């Protein structure tokens, strides 16, 4: 078994990935990145709106 693995390591040919497979991988990675950016932006907006709401409530209490 070990001999087989060593023999396999010696025959190190560059791995050829078909172009369309590479394209699909890039599309998936790009989609994941876009989704992550959207989530971060939504979370930031949510925090910002929450802060605004709290500030408005505080202002109303201090000026009756």
From Swiss-Prot:
Cellular component GO terms, alphabetical: host cell membrane; membrane
Compartmental location: Host membrane
Its membrane topology: Single-pass membrane protein
Keywords: Host membrane, Membrane, Transmembrane, Transmembrane helix
Pfam families from the UniProt entry: HHV-5_US34A
Entry's transmembrane regions: 15-37
Similarity annotation: Belongs to the HHV-5 US34A protein family.
Protein name, as recorded: Uncharacterized protein US34A
Source organism: Human cytomegalovirus (strain AD169)
Record lineage: Viruses, Duplodnaviria, Heunggongvirae, Peploviricota, Herviviricetes
